[in-house]
Amino acid sequence: MDTESQYSGYSYKSGHSRSSRKHRDRRDRHRSKSRDGGRGDKSVTIQAPGEPLLDNESTRGDERDDNWGETTTVVTGTSEHSISHDDLTRIAKDMEDSVPLDCSRHLGVAAGATLALLSFLTPLAFLLLPPLLWREELEPCGTACEGLFISVAFKLLILLLGSWALFFRRPKASLPRVFVLRALLMVLVFLLVVSYWLFYGVRILDARERSYQGVVQFAVSLVDALLFVHYLAVVLLELRQLQPQFTLKVVRSTDGASRFYNVGHLSIQRVAVWILEKYYHDFPVYNPALLNLPKSVLAKKVSGFKVYSLGEENSTNNSTGQSRAVIAAAARRRDNSHNEYYYEEAEHERRVRKRRARLVVAVEEAFTHIKRLQEEEQKNPREVMDPREAAQAIFASMARAMQKYLRTTKQQPYHTMESILQHLEFCITHDMTPKAFLERYLAAGPTIQYHKERWLAKQWTLVSEEPVTNGLKDGIVFLLKRQDFSLVVSTKKVPFFKLSEEFVDPKSHKFVMRLQSETSV
């Protein structure tokens, strides 16, 4: 009873102190407002719209809007510029996209083009220099020599087309390091051409070789060597990576979306480029709004306890025992956060199904209206609407259902009104069904399906403990990082399978069925 009387006394005092504190706050605020009107000092007013500045927090604090942070008005006396989190994200993305001019990539392309031009013009120079320098001393070229001209011409044409198809393709990415195999091939071609030029200068130019057929055969041998180098390039750059040797597991660090891929012998940086190509059309679009837990779970407060010692005698022992009892009681209380999360998820799924049903019905009615208009136009020809006008005409009937569904599924940042109209116009133009129109919105599509401004990152960072020019090995882990998330790639070598053969004699499957007079068949 003493404890209850003390508790009620504390409650009365606390309530009285709250009421007196409110009156004192009103009086102080009125005085400060009158002083601020005369001085013109800085002032900050934060007020939720639709509610008075002073409300009973003890009774209405839990009934406020969950989105109060989005509707709060902030007025400052010194602010001339404002910035939001979206602005900061946009600025960071602009800084990420503003990649400086990559001189190394253009230098590599220029070196490759120069070397290709040198190797292509060298056989022609071998054929043209002797007639230009010592035409009178050359022996006449016979039929076999003239036939070699045709061989050189077609081989050079094949070499030109093959080099264009293999080397002069639009680059998919800018690699952080040199492509080792391609650099080795370029060095090999350079050494081959320089060796032929040295031999040509010493044995043909200095000696003034009179046999023009020997000069032509020397040029043909150079073209043949270049063709073999091109064949080697095809094997090293294209065929070597086709045989699967490793299994890659790619996991997105934020939501855990994962995929498995099989690749051949590639360097780490080339595997990174290949993974990014697969990522944009295999992984669903990254939606950070789906990562947050429900607000009811996040806002749950853990109850705390304060232990006060009211007596003077044996205060230490009493307080220690009481605190232990309270802590033990708190430990025995079960945390019901998982139950709240379960019911929140069930409620969200029910809401999504409801919004989806309304959206499907609205789209079906809109497309039915389009078909009815088309049938009426065939019977009574009049002014025909183009697909854009038809899309704008029926969009109003489905706009509200579409907006609510996108908000419920948190897809509204990825679908603007203009993009929905363009997709609707596309479906009307190609006479597509309502299900074909809704396919883009009912499920999250691949990343490349959405507008580039929403997902495209021009710069990724490759993080690896191994040099990126090394080939893949079993157990290698590397990361592909961008501003919002990263892709974690782990490598496993394809196991070696040993198969054994077991011969089964066909006669072992045969059997004899003996029938007796009592046997019924």
UniProtKB/Swiss-Prot annotation:
Superkingdom of this protein's organism: Eukaryota
Cross-referenced InterPro entries: VANGL
Composition skew (Low complexity), residue ranges: 69-81
Effect of F437S: In NTD; the mutation protein completely abrogates interaction with DVL1 compared to wild-type
Membrane topology classification: Multi-pass membrane protein
Subcellular location: Cell membrane
UniProt keyword annotation of Membrane present: yes
Spans annotated as Disordered: 1-81
Basic residues bias spans: 15-33
Residue intervals annotated with topology Cytoplasmic: 1-108, 169-178, 239-521
Gene Ontology cellular-component terms listed: apical cytoplasm; apical plasma membrane; basolateral plasma membrane; cell pole; cell-cell junction; COPII-coated ER to Golgi transport vesicle; glutamatergic synapse; lateral plasma membrane
Family annotation (Pfam families): Strabismus
This protein's name: Vang-like protein 2
Native organism: Homo sapiens
